[in-house]
Structure formats: structure tokens, C-alpha cells
Amino acid sequence: MMNKWAKNWFGLSKKSVSTNSAKGSLPRSPLASIQTNQPVEEGEGGSLPSVSNLGPSSIDHPMEEFASDQSTVGNRNSNDILPEVDHEPSGYLKLQIGSLVLGGPHTDAALAMECSRLNQLFVVVQFGTTEFVSPPLKWESPGRDIGTSSRDSANVSRSSSMMSSHPIPTPAIQRTSSIPNPLTPSYVVFDVAKPVPIDVNIYDHGNNNEFVGRTYIHPSYNYGQFEQFCNSVEVSPAYNRMVDLRLSLNTVFQPLSQHSYGPDDFVPLKLIGKGTFGQVYLVRKKDTERVYAMKVLSKKVIVRRKEVAHTVGERDILVQTSAADSPFIVALRFSFQTPKDLYLVTDYMAGGELFWHLQKSVRFPEERAKFYIAELLLALQALHKRGIVYRDLKPENILLDVQGHIALCDFGLSKANLSVGTTTRTFCGTTDYLAPEVILDEAGYDMMVDFWSLGVLLYEMTCGWSPFYADNTQQLYKNIVFGKVRFPRGLLSVEARDLIKLLLNRNPKHRLGAHGDVEEVMKHPFFDGIDWKKLAAKEISPPFKPIVEGEIDVSNFDVEFTNKAIDRDFSSTDEMSTSAPLSSTVQNGFKGFTYIDASAMDEAFGYHNSNDSASSISSQDDYSKDNSDMDLNRANDEVFMGQIDP
């Protein structure tokens, strides 16, 4: 079966599956290779699934249950203090990873023996939601060690040229002992839109990627300032024999070298997905060499399928979620367009899709499922606070980063601007995860549909199959509206079963979360022992770490795509590509699509490119104006775009 990770990145496979069609994916079957479901949307005629033979809705249906055990999730600590800056930073931060220094009261011979056992260490650098995986650490020749000087604020002249014009000096090396120290000559450049600390995690590849230790650095965001750090590493209990472990790093921050981006600013590395509207590539940004995921969509296909409103709406929601700054939502970094195509550039999550890992494991231990559900709650919290209902929660839309934290993606079925007390009626979602109120369409629905899907997801992760499994879609709908949910004997804890029961309450007014949204769900005993502040700061170690060999590792993607030769110009390929160009009226439907993840870039640097609307940057002020203009254009061009979700 095709790996849905590759097809579902950005939701390429989800669009407009008619609800009254005989075709479509069957729901997941119990204890078998998990089948993936296509989301469904309202058809052109607004047709809903045939449920007239289902009878009245079943409210608060009792669920059968059995017992199991429960345990807790571990955590780690850190201190976050950022230096003050005299401006809103927008530019490039270059980080050079120096060497590890292992000190302490041991003899040189003992330390040398200790180091020889740790010859496959590597570093995962977390910069906001962007991550970098270093090459394996190399051992420096014996008798050499770096100095342990602390932060050095040596000035580097300010310049708007490329990063190479101000290379980071090599750390001073001096002979201090006969201890070999690991050395990595790697460096990374991050695109900066806001001041954040740098989270550095060290892992031992030679010991099944065991976590070794963690440290933070808090770089200055003053332009041209070079800094040198030699930070103490907080080691894990398994490596507490490593006394006084330190990591040397250097940073320098520089202003932007350009203020607009297009396809020519990125180099394609691999094709990682393909769908109805276009392709998804693993790309490298030329100026910073950062790796991202780029979705390329054909405008003509979008217009032909009347999906302009949904496509631009997805971009709008990605802008809002990027502003939310949630570490558990895939961040939009750039969006731009050409006369033919739309481009969405987000962080690349090399850990793979949760669906892919669930398919391999069949089910997860309860503690692992608890960790994912807890982080998903924080993602939903960020969405709901901004009036966004997600509507398509499922394993295919949950990505893992290199360290094993989740990141929610694909907002094509989400709806924004849903205030408290209001409802919507569009029939959309994925069959296995549809809430009863969506199927019955009696009085519309609200954000409670996300909690129903969360309950289905928790059941599926812990039991290995869908709670409402059926051989056909109509029977699946009946099971969702009426069916009993049965729990395998002895598999789940009392708390897990109770949480699933409360989330799968068929009356949305009595569903857990109805009276306090995410915060109400977080208080359930299932989550006792979780420090939510540490979880939000990613200070709790994930129970599972994906195998990732480097920042461009695509081993978690379908080889059907990654083994294909790629077109270097990113242009979408479809049967309409050689037809007449789109009219200016239709092109106006895509107005305001361009975005760069730096709300203050226009104001900070005075960049306004009025001659090139396809490459202009949308600041927060401009974004609001663009949104207003775009709404008018959408209303004028509904013949091309289809109806906007009410």
C-alpha cells in the first residue's frame, strides 16, 4: 500500500470526494494493515450522505469497557532568558557547532576511554519549529581541546551582503590535555523572523539514538554581533558519568540580503509527494541553505475544480497559525505565486507521518498515545483560541519532527472565524473521524467536532483499529451515529477508557470540552502527571524518536516519489499547462497569497515592491488589507471558485 505520508503532506490527496459516490476508501479494518481514508467535502450540489434510514440520533449511548494500567511521562528542564534587542529582528542567524569538551576529576586515560565509547554523537538543533540535524561528531586528534571562554561579544561590521562575507571565525584551539574531544565542523543558517533561543540536543547514534543531554543558547539579535558560547550540557541520567560536559558554539546575526522570494530562490532536492493539484518537494533555500518542504499547486487545476476559495483559505489559516507561534503546528515560512502556480513553503518534518508509524506498530503503548494526544491538545488550543476549527484530525495529518514531537499540518478543510456560539454546516472531514452532528446535519456543528475526532484518534492509537469500523461507508455512518464502542479487555487504563467515552459523547453539548474547550479536556485524570508548561516548551522527552540520519533524510517517505527524477524549475505539470493563460479576473482570486514569516520586515527595512505583486511581502497591516480585497475578489469570481464555507 502506498505510504500516505508522501501523498498527504499539505493534504494533496484530500480534495472534493463526492459523498454520494460509490467510490472511495474503505474505513480502517481491525487488526489489519491500517487502511487510509480520503477526506470528504460537500459536493457541488451540497449533497450529504444518505442517512434518512438511520432514524433519530442516539445521544449519550453507553459504551462497554474493560480495564488496564496507566503510567507517567518523563521530562527535562531548561532556563530561557533572551538578551534585549534594539529592533524587531529579521535576517539570518548563522550558528557554528564547535566541539564537545569533557572535563571533571577523572584521569586523562579514563576520559579517553569514556570518549571512545561515544564515537557516534550527533546534534539536533531546534530553532523555533525549524530543526537541523548535524553530521556525526568527529573525534579531534588527541591532545587538543578548545578553550572555555564564555560569551564574547566581539563586533563584526554590519553589512547587507551574503553570509559568506562574514564567516564565523574558527574557535581558538589550544593544547590542554591528552583527551580526544569530538568535533563537528558543521554550521547552519536560520531564517529569523522573531527572537527565540536555540535548543541544542545531543544524541548517541551508537546507542539506539539515546538522548545524551541538552543545552540552550540565547544569541544576541543585534546585527553583525559575533558571539562565542561554551555551554554546560544538562546530561540525562543514563549519561551522568559524563562530568562537566560542555559544548562550544558560535553565532552571528546579519540583516536580510533580499526581501522577496520566488521559485528561483530554492533548489529542489527530492520529490516527496504528488496529488491532484500539484507536487511537494524537499527543497533547499539558496541564501541560507535551510531545508524546507515546498508545495507547488497548479492554478488552472484549482480553478477548474472550483477550489480557489479553499486553497487561498488554507494559506490564510496557515498565516494565522504561524502567528500563533505554536510549536505543534507546521509553520508557513513563505508563500508566493507565478502566473501558473502557487507555492507554499513550510518547515520540513523529517520524522515522518504518524500514520506511517502507526501502520508499522499497529497500535501504540498507552503512554506514547497519551504524549501525542497531549501535544495535539496544545495544537488545538492554539487553533480554537483564534476561532479556527480544524475538522480533519487524523494520523495522516500529524507529522513528527526529528525528536519525536508532533506537528499538525494540512488546513485545507479548516474553517476560520468561528466565534463562540456560532456553527457551520459544511459536510467535510474524513469518514472514520466524522462526528455524528456532521453526518446528521440537524443544527450545524462547532469546534466540538475536533474533540470527537480526538477521541477516535486516541482509540485507534491504543487499540489498533477504528472504533466504528465497517465494510462500507453507509454502515460506518450508522455505527458513528448509533454503534457501541467496545474496548479490548485489559488493554486500556480506566482513565483512558473514561476519556474516550467522554470525547465520544454523541451530544456535542455534553461532550468533554463543551464547557471549557481544551482546558477542560486537559484536566481529565488521564493527563495527571503531565506538566503542561514543560510540554508546551518541548521540555518533556518524547517516548519515541524517529530514525533520521540527517536534515535531508527522506527515508520516511514513499520511494515511489523519492526515487523519481525531479524537474529543476518546479513548474507544475498537468494537461492544462499548455492552454491559454488565466485571465486577470481569475488571477485576482489569488491576490494576497504572498507571505513571508516576518511580520515586521516591511516596516523594519522599508521594503515595498509595488511593481511586482507576485513577489511582494505581506506585513501584518498589508495582510489585513489584502484579506479585505481578496474577499471582494472572491465574491466577484464565485463562478470560478465555488462557494465559501458559510
Swiss-Prot record:
Protein kinase that is part of growth control pathway which is at least partially redundant with the cAMP pathway. Residues 266-527 form the Protein kinase domain. The lineage of its organism: Eukaryota, Fungi, Dikarya, Ascomycota, Taphrinomycotina. One of its GO terms (molecular function) is protein serine kinase activity. GO terms for biological process: intracellular signal transduction; negative regulation of conjugation with cellular fusion; negative regulation of G2/M transition of mitotic cell cycle; TORC1 signaling. It holds the Pfam family Pkinase. Residues 68-80 have a biased composition (Polar residues). This is Serine/threonine-protein kinase sck2. ATP binds at residues 272-280, 295. Residues 149-165, 610-621 have a biased composition (Low complexity). Belongs to the protein kinase superfamily. AGC Ser/Thr protein kinase family. PKC subfamily.
